[in-house]
Structure formats: C-alpha cells, structure tokens
From Swiss-Prot:
Belongs to the LamB/PxpA family. This is 5-oxoprolinase subunit A. Gene3D superfamilies: Glycoside hydrolase/deacetylase (3.20.20.370). The lineage of its organism: Bacteria, Pseudomonadati, Pseudomonadota, Betaproteobacteria, Neisseriales. Pfam families: LamB_YcsF. Keywords: ATP-binding, Hydrolase, Nucleotide-binding.
Length: 245
C-alpha cells in the first residue's frame, strides 16, 4: 500500500490550526519570526500532541511585514544565528510539553531560494546538521536543498504541494503570478493523486515533471486549507493510499 504524509504550515496566527491538526500528519510550526507568537506555537503544539501529529520546525527570515516571503541575502553567520535562534526556541518549547521536534522545513523565501541556490542550500543543511544531526530536512522534490540535505548526512523528506502550481523545471510558480495557486478542490485533488500515484505533476506549460511525493503540503494560511485537507485526505484513502507520517 502506498503511503504519504500530509503537512501544513501552522502557528502563523491564521486561525485554522485546531481544525487542520485533526486532518494532517505533520505540522510545520512557525517559530515566531516571520509570523505568529509564542502563544500560537504553544497552542499548535498542544493540538498536535492531542492528535499524534509529527512536529517540525518552520523557520523563516525575520520579516513579518512580508510574511517571510521576500528574498533576503544574509551572511552565513547571520543565517546561522537566525536559524539557531528559531530551532532552539521551538525545541525548548517542544521539550517543555514532552514532545520531540522531528524535522526542519524552511519557510517562504528561504525555502524557495535554497531550492535553486546551491550555496544557500548547503549552508542551510549544514546549520541544521550542526544543530541536531538526527533532524530530517523537508524540502521541495528535486530541489538543490533536498540534495544538500542528503550531502550533509541528514534524512530528507521530499515535499510536493497540493495548492501550488509548478514551473517546467520543478520549482513552484512565483506567488507574484496570478496562476501561482490552485484554488479549486477538484484541481488540487487531481494534482495530488497524480503526484502520489504517478510520480509526476503537470507544469503550467503542460509538460510533465517527475516528483517524489513523501509529503504533501497544504498552506495553513490559505482560505481553502481545511476544505482541501478534508477532501484530499478522503480521496487518498478512497484510492487505497495510507495517510501517515
């Protein structure tokens, strides 16, 4: 039986965490830099614990004004401090609630930059490995960040997106474009099933891109996140695909 993880970005102050945590199997917990608060983190951790959901850190650039979605070019020392600060804080809060942090998934611009920039990808992977080599690194399927994680000796989780469209090179369509996001349930479900069952996704130019779907992301800040999660989980199970971390 095929198996796939379902994840969402949480603790970003968007209000849908409790509902999503009854449907997903991995929670990407924001670390109060690009969005959210300590209270949001603690609440998300409590809901995750109640539902047996795997916990990962979701660190981003310290850029609340742009929700961490604007590219930054930090020095290695500044990036190390930025990530260690966020990972350390979440790890401490997890331990305080008797939980374990299992993986790291960078947020927004950091995630997308590292997908295409090998120097940044290597730096991010090295920082995570130095922080805790037992952590896994979640990154875009086929990306340089995924390769860097493997090279750094980390376990990796290859991620695909239910609610984002793809470029022919396998990267995500930039949010600045009007066709960046998938808004209909039907299109999201079809895209998910194609990625999980067939190992490919249709790009915006109609070409097919090979993907490895270890985990499917739904954005927790999206207006359709809960509906997507309900329907996608239902359709995966109906197709004989187990939803599990």
């Amino acid at each position: 039986m095929k198996q796939v993880d379902l994840n969402a970005d949480l603790a970003e102050g968007c209000g849908s965490d409790e509902a999503l945590l009854q449907l997903i199997t991995s929670a990407n917990i924001a670390c109060a830099q690009h969005a959210g608060s300590i209270a949001d983190i603690r609440a998300a951790l409590a809901y995750a614990q109640q539902n047996g959901v795997r916990i990962g850190a979701h660190p981003g650039y310290p850029d609340r004004e742009n929700f961490g979605r604007t590219e930054m070019n930090l020095s290695e020392a500044d990036l190390r401090a930025c990530l260690n600060y966020q990972l350390g804080a979440l790890q401490a809060l997890c331990r305080d609630q008797g939980l374990e942090m299992a993986y790291v998934k960078p947020h927004g611009a950091m995630y997308n930059q590292a997908a295409k920039n090998r120097a940044l990808a290597d730096t991010v992977a090295r920082i995570v490995a130095d922080f805790d080599p037992k952590l896994k690194l979640m990154a875009l399927s086929g990306s340089l960040l995924l390769e860097a994680g493997k090279a750094a000796g980390l376990g990796v989780i290859s991620e695909v997106f239910a609610d984002r469209r793809y470029m022919p090179d396998g990267t995500l369509v930039p949010r600045s474009r009007p066709d960046a996001q998938v808004d209909s349930d039907e299109e999201a479900i079809a895209q998910v099933l194609q990625m999980v069952r067939d190992g490919q996704v249709k790009a915006v130019d109609g070409s097919l891109v090979a993907v490895q779907a270890d985990s499917i992301c739904l954005h927790g800040d999206g207006p359709h996140a809960v509906v997507f999660a309900e329907k996608i989980r239902q359709e995966l199970l109906a197709a004989g695909i187990k939803v599990s971390a």
